[in-house]
């Protein structure tokens, strides 16, 4: 294989328990987002737009749908003879272990994949965040700063800080303290789960970590703290753009609603930074004579006869006459009958809502209806169907 300056490793095996029914039968990175996309489209598109053409995607939990979606990477221009996109599922190791035991272990068990390209840098990414980033700028700052490791960071609300790896830096952005998901955080500067490593440094630490019986084999809990203990040059790269961890029902719904702002912070329509996805090859959408649509995203193949207000509809959605869909996210191939009312809900793929049913309330919690559920005629859904 020809040498590659950068190899990206995309961690896409997450179960996503906090997404409930949405990840019951599929990996979190394959969850639908934004009327057209899957969550994994965003880091993959970032790689393409950043000129990174060698990406290993590490899958594990419920990988069938994700693997089928990724294919050979052609949607992201990653179908290459040298490099491109490679799916890296767990395999039976010599010690008899099958599953990846942590984020660091997943990379460790695929060192041979990385070694064949003899890279200078390894970019480690998470497959479950919504954002646009030019990774090349981060890599260049890493290179110019003489860093061993660079971690992309941003400030988060204090109440959310315990969900993240939290760090402190000096005035030159050198990281001097890192704590994974602290109960009482000292800072609100959070790791985004995006790392640039010098490959020789990372390789050495992965091998050391694999031999530690007490390790959790995790970047945040083990690798980064061990590197800090060795006083390596670990630097922060401050990211100021939109970034959303969509690991909960509420945050996923909010991120979809963010797209509907008059001047959205996260703009899907930016021509200079396209988000690539697999084309569903649907027919054009049809808007009926009595339909009403306001501040919404409507994808291909939709047939709308009712009222859509401040909502995101994926491809192949039917909404019959007299129905209202408001402040909701409707996944592909959902069929909504006549005189249905839906407020603040996420309906997963293939849901059928029969005539006269009511789902959700204008001011309540966000409801989730599991894929392929059938909501009977005139049913009033007061609890999420998961």
From Swiss-Prot:
GO terms for molecular function: ATP binding; glucose-1-phosphate adenylyltransferase activity. Pathway: Glycan biosynthesis; glycogen biosynthesis. Pfam families: Hexapep_GlmU, NTP_transferase. It is an enzyme of class 2 (transferase). CDD domains: ADP_Glucose_PP, LbH_G1P_AT_C. Homotetramer. Involved in the biosynthesis of ADP-glucose, a building block required for the elongation reactions to produce glycogen. Catalyzes the reaction between ATP and alpha-D-glucose 1-phosphate (G1P) to produce pyrophosphate and ADP-Glc. Belongs to the bacterial/plant glucose-1-phosphate adenylyltransferase family. This is Glucose-1-phosphate adenylyltransferase. It comes from Exiguobacterium sibiricum (strain DSM 17290 / CCUG 55495 / CIP 109462 / JCM 13490 / 255-15).
